[in-house]
């Protein structure tokens, strides 16, 4: 092997490094510095000949060294007009950097490097990418700052490619074959002449995408399927869809817009989800590129090369070739271990992140935490102590946890106890709704074999779907005095879908229900029917608000008032500038968050205090957010006290009928007396 490597080195030509000095050591001959670099290469397996202004490989100095075990070679910042033949004979080479040379074409002998996983050809003068480069087992290919006019169709054969950087070239379009690279995580096409992006890019498992400084006017709607994307750079483009004001807000709003646009065009989101790639193990960005920051910053400006050409050197992400640059090849030798399976058996491909606003956003986490302040910190059960859920169960997302059948009964029980303790208007109604929902859920189920006792250990219960004749009596419905039975740790019979069960009026169940059985809003299905007195109160309040605000109100008045926008407008109509700031929905985000809704409601209550509404007549912000009768009564009393144009809801008096009868008889007598006086 040593002879095979030393042969090309001694094939002829002059030794260019004989009179070159090592940077920082002006008195050291070039041959001595090259010899020292070769000695270190034999000892470490890494050949570093960077920044030496070499035009030819030092063949004479390499004649006496065995370079067959070299795995990394750094030939950057030199003046090589072509790839050295000696470098193409290092068959064990895994990483090769030819950054910042004068290459105008590539040596076909590069196809001999069958172990090469990293290739850096940036900042050269290449006008095309030969097909034999696409036959290498590359994981990282960097060819930025060249003169490429197109990518070859053979690029689809790079099945192991994870990072592709073709920035600062002359590309006018991307081939469709690029979208078949199922391992691609990082795609950089910055500073080209692209006018469109392929729709098929939405099927790639990209973690980072940079298409800034191009001519792109429309982002494909299919990009909403990029569920692993963490960084997207799209500045300096004449974007029209999404609009500029949405793009300035960040990635989350962009993907929200794309999802809504897909719905408007008739391509339902459910039709887009099956076309996503199958479940795979995504590679985090910190594993691929440790220590890197995707800040997209520019350097000081133009940079000149030996050929005299000048090109802009912006966004050069891999200018320096160091030990960290070969991390990809290390990952190839030491792959990551298998991922731990989920306890509930769900795979990665089963969880579809449809709404990008709901996850990985610190600001939204604050909204969610503020809304959850209304809930008790622990769940309390009536039928004795029950084991708490496991730690892995607590780590699951709140929305997924509430959808699970085994915890639905716990949430219902907690809601029922909370309503009993609050003593608010409508609590008995919610209890009855709860019990009817559970009774309907267990209509087709037989009695459980065992029940948990108050003092004994919890026992598991089995549920049989369907009723077999003569085997086991059906479970009697719970009465209003008895608590709901809890059997086992957290098990409950669920023979019907969760959407068919009426649940109490709580924001927990509003957020967890994504679709209802009727075309109306899901919240309208979950809200219990009001009492007759509450109906009369809602009707009277609707008339007052419509006359005050001069606009029609939706049918679900309590839900319309829950975000506090109409309440703040009403306060400003009663007394101008009583609420100086109102949070209103935007076209991109049509529904206010829980935190903003609560701020609106608190501003309305504060305005009521300033207008003279007694503190005893005011309700809590949670009453208005939940749309209870006490909250509606507060709104009506504020209008009556300040506006004075609406009567208070009074019960019909028992003596009203007698007074009317007396009045009619008295007027009749007066009429008779008057007629007789006129007749006489």
From Swiss-Prot:
The keyword Nucleotide-binding does not apply. Residues 531-644 form the Calponin-homology (CH) domain. Its main location: membrane. LRR repeats lie at residues 41-64, 67-90, 92-113, 114-136, 138-158, 159-181, 182-204, 206-226, 227-250. Residues 1-22, 440-453, 510-528 have a biased composition (Low complexity). It holds the Pfam family LRR_8. It is found in: Cell membrane. Widely expressed across tissues, with the most abundant expression in spleen, testes, thymus, intestine, and blood. Expressed in macrophages. Residues 330-345, 357-371, 385-418 have a biased composition (Basic and acidic residues). InterPro entries: CH_dom (IPR001715), CH_dom_sf (IPR036872), Leu-rich_rpt (IPR001611), Leu-rich_rpt_typical-subtyp (IPR003591), LRR_dom_sf (IPR032675), LRR_domain-containing (IPR050216). Accessory protein that regulates signaling by multiple TLRs, acting as a broad-spanning regulator of the innate immune response. In macrophages, binds LPS and promotes proper docking of LPS in lipid raft membrane. May be required for lipid raft maintenance. This is Leucine-rich repeat and calponin homology domain-containing protein 4. It comes from Mus musculus. The gene is Lrch4.
């Amino acid at each position: 092997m040593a002879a095979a490597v030393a042969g090309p080195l001694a094939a002829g030509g002059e030794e260019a490094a004989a009179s070159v000095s090592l940077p920082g050591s002006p008195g050291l001959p070039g041959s001595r510095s090259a010899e020292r670099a070769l000695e270190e290469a034999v000892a470490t397996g890494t050949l570093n000949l960077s920044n030496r202004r070499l035009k030819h490989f030092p063949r004479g100095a390499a004649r006496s060294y065995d370079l067959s075990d070299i795995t990394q070679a750094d030939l950057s910042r030199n003046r090589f007009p072509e790839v050295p033949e000696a470098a193409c004979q290092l068959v064990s080479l895994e990483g090769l950097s030819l950054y910042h040379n004068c290459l105008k074409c590539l040596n076909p002998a590069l196809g001999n490097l069958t172990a090469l996983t990293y290739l850096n050809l940036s900042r050269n003068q290449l006008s095309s990418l030969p097909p034999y480069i696409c036959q290498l087992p590359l994981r990282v290919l960097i060819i930025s700052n060249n003169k490429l006019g197109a990518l070859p169709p053979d690029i689809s054969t790079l099945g192991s490619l994870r990072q592709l950087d073709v920035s600062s070239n002359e590309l006018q379009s991307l081939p469709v074959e690029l979208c078949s690279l199922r391992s691609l995580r990082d795609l950089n096409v910055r500073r080209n002449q692209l006018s469109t992006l392929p729709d098929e890019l939405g099927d790639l498992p990209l973690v980072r995408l940079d298409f800034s400084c191009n001519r792109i006017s429309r982002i494909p709607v299919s990009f909403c399927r990029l569920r692993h994307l963490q960084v997207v750079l799209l500045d300096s483009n004449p974007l029209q869809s999404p609009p500029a004001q949405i793009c300035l807000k960040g990635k989350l709003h962009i993907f929200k817009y794309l999802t809504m646009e897909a719905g408007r065009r008739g391509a339902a989101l459910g039709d887009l989800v099956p076309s996503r790639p199958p479940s795979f193990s995504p590679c985090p960005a910190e594993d691929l590129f440790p220590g890197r920051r995707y800040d997209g910053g520019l350097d000081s400006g133009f940079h000149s090369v030996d050929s005299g050409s000048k090109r802009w050197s912006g966004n050069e992400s891999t200018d320096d070739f160091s030990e960290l640059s070969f991390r990809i090849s290390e990952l190839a030798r030491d792959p990551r271990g298998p991922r731990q399976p989920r306890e509930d058996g769900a795979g990665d491909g089963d969880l579809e992140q449809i709404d990008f606003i709901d996850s990985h956003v610190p600001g939204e986490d604050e909204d969610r935490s503020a809304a959850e302040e209304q809930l008790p910190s622990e769940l309390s059960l009536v039928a004795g102590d029950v084991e708490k859920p496991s730690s892995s169960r607590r780590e699951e997302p709140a929305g997924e946890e509430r959808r699970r059948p085994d915890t639905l009964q716990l949430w219902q029980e907690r809601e029922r106890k909370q309503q009993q303790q609050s003593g608010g208007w409508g609590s008995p109604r919610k209890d009855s709704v709860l019990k009817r929902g559970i009774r309907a859920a267990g209509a087709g189920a037989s009695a459980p074999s065992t029940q948990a006792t108050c003092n004994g250990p919890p026992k598991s219960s089995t549920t049989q779907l369907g009723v077999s004749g003569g085997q086991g009596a059906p479970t009697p419905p719970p009465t209003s005095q008895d608590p709901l039975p809890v059997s086992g740790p957290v098990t409950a019979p669920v023979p019907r879908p969760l959407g068919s069960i009426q649940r109490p009026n709580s924001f927990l169940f509003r957020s967890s229900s994504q679709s209802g059985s009727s075309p109306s809003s899901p919240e309208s299905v979950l809200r219990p029917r009001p009492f007759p007195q509450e109906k009369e109160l809602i009707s009277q309040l609707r008339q007052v608000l419509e006359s005050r605000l001069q606009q029609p109100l939706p049918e679900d008045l309590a839900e319309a008032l829950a975000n506090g926008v109409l309440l703040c407008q009403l306060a400003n109509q009663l007394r101008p500038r009583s609420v100086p700031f109102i949070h209103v929905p935007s076209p991109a985000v049509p529904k206010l968050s829980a935190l903003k809704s609560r701020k609106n409601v608190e501003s309305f209550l504060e305005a009521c205090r300033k207008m003279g509404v007694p503190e005893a007549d005011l309700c809590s912000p949670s009453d208005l957010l939940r749309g209870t009768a006490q909250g509606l009564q507060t709104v009506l009393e504020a209008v009556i006290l300040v506006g004075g144009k609406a009567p208070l809801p009074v019960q019909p008096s028992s003596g009203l009928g007698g007074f009317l009868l007396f009045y009619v008889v008295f007027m009749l007598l007066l009429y008779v007396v008057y007629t007789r006086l006129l007749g006489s």
